[in-house]
Amino acid sequence: KTPAPVGIFGPGWKAPSDIRLQIRDDALVLNDNGGRSIHFEPLLPGEAVYSRSESLWLVRGGKATQPDGHTLARLWASLPPDIRLSPHLYLATNSAQGPWWILGWSERVPGAEDVLPAPLPPYRVLTGLADRFGRTLTYRREAAGDLAGEITGVTDGAGREFRLVLTTQAQRAEEARKQRTASLSSPDTPRPLSASAFPDTLPGTEYGPDRGIRLSAVWLMHDPAYPESLPGAPLARYTYTEAGELLAVYDRSNTQVRAFTYDAQHPGRMVAHRYAGRPEMRYRYDDTGRVVEQLNPAGLSYRYLYEQDRITVTDSLNRREVLHTEGGAGLKRVVKKELADG
């Protein structure tokens, strides 16, 4: 098992911030919350290594320049010197065009028994992004409390500051209880989900406990270009089911722009989704959790047939594509694709 915890959008969803690098004596292990575990040999300062199976570069800081002719030489030179020269930072990218994922560590409030100065942790987390033009995103993580280590602030290269509002399962359950109480006292208020169905904690997954921390809203807090014209509502808002699954997304006008439905027996298994103003797209699965049919009432639908080394995709016009695969389990890869038109 690899560290693949439920992320800030709930089970079944991945976010770039979920990337994590384990630093061991004999290996470097890059994990995401999709369960991928990419192993590298330990790196010397400034050294770079490439994973062919994942098309991913990993580079350790500690060198001002990469050798002439190196695939990443120009992209490396676009980084600020303090990042390039730090041997304690690691950087990952899947393209010579960028962007870089900057892997560092978050500050935390030391405990009463901690020895100071505290050593660096045996892992790295995403602390920022940088593209080949020098534009950056910097992530700020909570240093203490229930949200310690979670991203609660982002600053972009233009100096705009964003606040990420995170909620716990207990907070969402309390809000559900308040809404239910209000609905009982006012017959005109829509009846919310039963508070008894909204637990204060969530069950664990095969990878470990689900802390129930979810992203609820994104606010613009500072804009150097328009400091007096900040919006009075969040740029985006997210709601969740009683099981912590992403239920709906709202834009800054409080208009619902996305909606999702899940299988009650399989947390995080999405069976339908819808964009605002569009018909609902539905999915059917087999007993192993693979999608076997995608149903679109206003367009093309698809059927998926899984065989040992091939996946056949047939649309509702009876056109067929075939994906040929090699390998097994988590190392299975598509090696050839037959298109419907040859």
Model-derived features: positions:
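Phosphate-centric recognition/catalysis
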Residues: 23
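Extended charged/polar low-complexity repeat regions
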Residues: 9-16, 26-342
